[in-house]
Swiss-Prot record:
SUPFAM superfamilies: MFS general substrate transporter
Membrane topology recorded in Swiss-Prot or TrEMBL: Multi-pass membrane protein
Protein name per the record: MFS-type transporter SLC18B1
PANTHER family reported for this sequence: GH10249P, MFS-TYPE TRANSPORTER SLC18B1
Localization annotation: Cytoplasmic vesicle, Secretory vesicle membrane; Cytoplasmic vesicle, Secretory vesicle, Synaptic vesicle membrane
Gene Ontology MF annotations: monoamine:proton antiporter activity; polyamine:proton antiporter activity; transmembrane transporter activity
Modification N-acetylmethionine, positions: 1
Record topological domains on the Extracellular side: 54-69, 121-126, 188-194, 254-271, 325-330, 398-406
Lineage summary: Eukaryota, Metazoa, Chordata, Craniata, Vertebrata
């Protein structure tokens, strides 16, 4: 079996629920249902709190004296500290405990979201900007803990259906991204700056008692593998580049798209939230489909990764569109491109986690929560690298050369990662064919040597 295959052989020996028989994948146990409910509530709540900033925060920050580059850094610092948190929490997941990390992360994220709602009371200038950075950093640490624990728990509970489950739960991430901007824009227009943050922060905090009651605990011994061994695997390194490029594309839009749409099409804050809807909704709808296909037909994962990246690159060329194409910027075209981008993002993002997991198992990593913690932490860390670079680079480039060219440059990331993965898979297939031919030839020679000599 090649390294692109599913991690099912390793998972069937595991002790988590769902790892024993094929029947379990068809009929969920009560424990698996509780895991799904917990992960879904976390995805929905945390992604809503993350995404509400898009429609109105850049404008508020401008009023407080923040430049486009500074706004991009406020968005981007979240990802930088989520990166650090994911690496640390992934390494020490077994020692801390997945359930405690999950609950504590949600508590921190919900609490600081409420604090973000009172920042408008601060004076404009350095004090406001510094507090924005501080609150976002603490929020990132909480979210990093929750998402690392969630991914590990899911992979442990559903070892044979990782992509399907994660793809299905992306519906709730997508719903959070879908509901966050329009809800945030509506609450901002109706009640002002404070209410969106206080409302959504309270929702996240109210989910904690539910998760305390229903989320199961998973215990495991600490593994001996390291992040360094994992990330130095060539295939893991390339998939990490794919994750970074896709995440940076999402992050690029946070500080730039709302300002571009407001200035270009003179839309209100509420309508800007609906523009974000095209990307989030199409991603939420398409992700379960690509997750199911990735588990049922693992050989399709490589094509999803490659073509998803290439389509995403084309979308960013048309987002402005790039002036070289001489296409007039129109609102319907922008929304259409965002919808296609949501589908292509689902196509390329969903297979990355099971691909990393199967590669780790194929290279000698043990089947257990410690390996799941390493892979989850690495996935979260690489996503955070892109989410850190995207807003900062996007804010800087938009300030210097405009949104149209900035979006096109952003698209080059996914073009490069798509081409790199295509070349790797071609090399991998060629190597496997040569190895198989050599094995067949060696077997035939051994059989010939064992046959009696007829002469």
């Amino acid at each position: 079996m090649d390294t692109a295959g599913p991690p099912a052989p390793a998972g069937t020996e595991g002790d988590g629920p769902g790892g024993s028989t094929g029947e379990t994948s068809r009929r969920l146990s009560k424990e698996q249902i509780f895991v799904l409910v917990s992960a879904a509530s976390m995805n929905l709540g945390c992604m809503m709190t993350y995404s509400i900033l898009g429609p109105f925060f850049p404008k508020e920050a401008e009023k407080k004296g923040a430049s486009n580059t500074t706004i991009g850094m406020i968005f981007g610092c979240y990802a930088l500290f989520e990166l650090l948190a994911s690496l640390v929490f992934g390494k020490y997941l077994v020692h801390i405990g997945a359930k405690f990390m999950f609950i504590a992360g949600m508590f921190v994220s919900g609490g600081v979201t409420i604090l973000f709602g009172v920042l408008d009371q601060l004076p404009e200038g350095p004090i406001f900007i510094a507090m924005c950075f501080l609150v976002r950093i603490v929020d990132a640490i909480g979210f990093g803990a929750a998402i690392t624990a969630s991914s590990s728990i899911l992979a442990k509970a559903f070892p044979n259906n990782v992509a399907t489950v994660m793809g299905s739960l992306e519906v709730f991430s997508g719903l959070g991204l879908v509901a966050g901007p329009p809800l945030g824009g509506l609450l901002y227009q109706s009640f002002g700056y404070e209410v969106p943050f206080i409302f959504l922060g309270c929702i996240v905090l109210l989910m904690i008692p539910l998760n305390l009651c229903i989320l199961p605990s998973y215990e495991s011994d600490a593994g001996k593998q390291s992040f360094w061994k994992l990330v130095t695997l060539p295939k893991i390194g390339l998939i990490a580049f794919v994750i970074i490029s896709l995440s940076s594309c999402f992050g690029f839009l946070d500080p730039t798209l709302s300002l571009f749409v407001m200035k270009k099409f003179s839309l209100s804050t509420g309508y800007v939230g609906l523009v974000f809807l095209g990307l989030s909704l199409s991603y939420a709808i398409s992700s379960p489909l690509f997750g199911l296909l990735s588990d049922k037909m693992p050989n399709l994962r490589k094509w999803f990764l490659v073509f998803g990246n290439l389509i995403t690159a084309g979308c960013y060329m048309l987002l402005g569109p790039i002036p070289l194409l001489h296409i007039k910027s129109q609102l319907w075209l922008l929304v259409l491109v965002l919808v296609i981008n949501g589908v292509s993002a689902g196509m390329s993002i969903i297979p990355t986690f099971p691909e990393m997991l199967s590669c780790a198992y194929a290279n000698g990593f043990e089947d257990g929560i410690s390996t799941l913690g390493l892979v989850s932490g690495l996935f979260g860390a690489m996503w955070s690298v892109g989410a850190f670079m995207g807003p900062i680079l996007g804010g800087f480039l938009c300030e210097k050369i405009g949104f149209e060219w900035a979006a096109a440059i952003q698209g080059l990331w996914t073009l490069l990662s798509g081409v790199a993965m295509a070349l790797f898979y071609l090399w991998e297939d060629s190597t496997m064919r040569r190895s198989k031919a050599q094995n067949i030839l060696g077997t035939e020679e051994e059989q010939a040597a064992l046959l009696p000599n007829d002469t």
